[in-house]
């Protein structure tokens, strides 16, 4: 055999070796993909963490009431977990770190999901937050002067609730082409009283009340800011569309203990308690879910 023939035969082995390396790499990659793609999702046990908004102390009381008086009948134990950052909380629910959250209404959830793409679903209306108009200067809405300065929430979902309230009592008109529950200041088409609107974070409103004519927000926030409830000049019935929702990660909705969780929150004993409780963190702050 010549040296030339030996060189050719030796060279011909390399394509086969290269192909073998590629095949082994593909097999390894497929195995990795399969192990990750088929990794089991979170499976919830009978002890479930439920998130609440720490600034809304009554929400914690709701979870604790259900845990003590209702959840045992469904074979569950609930643990209330307070997290201030709403996006962090919703991410934790979507990822299965928490079984659910009760801090938001459907319009806030839509805002969060649209911005972050979380897989979350509303399930059961839990309660409604008392929401109204406060003033340090006037004793009724009718007393608000022409050109009064009114503070509304600076976040889209709750600003819509404030403006819809003003439209329902005839003080402003909103663009009929816009969903009123998500309206913004730019959607005001009629302002016969010449109100001047300012935007503030809900938690800041109580501190600013003495520098404006009126502010619109949640009773719980004004309570937390030590604003007496007699500073409230209008508390209309809370509309169901802004009810707190038990929000669950969409992939987990059919799990046995999540179904039981939904049943526990839908138990009529909760609404009866909300109606009759004397707990100062709940009474007049979180109210039963209305029919409309």
Describe each region flagged by the PLM:
Residues 29-32, 157-182, 262-292:
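Ligand-binding clefts/hinges and TM-proximal coupling segments of bilobed small-molecule sensing domains
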Residues 32-50, 71-72, 141-147:
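Immediate post-signal peptide segment of exported/extracytoplasmic ligand-binding proteins
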Residues 42-77:
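Short, polar/charged alpha-helical segment
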Residues 80-91, 178-207:
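Short helix-initiation/N-cap motifs at beta->coil->alpha
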Residues 84-86, 96-110, 127, 201-202, ...:
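Beta->alpha turn/N-cap motifs
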Residues 111-123, 136-138, 209-211, 216, ...:
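Ligand-binding "clamshell"
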Residues 123-173, 271-272:
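A conserved helix-loop-strand patch within extracytoplasmic ligand-binding domains
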Residues 123-135, 223-268, 283-292:
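Periplasmic-binding protein-like
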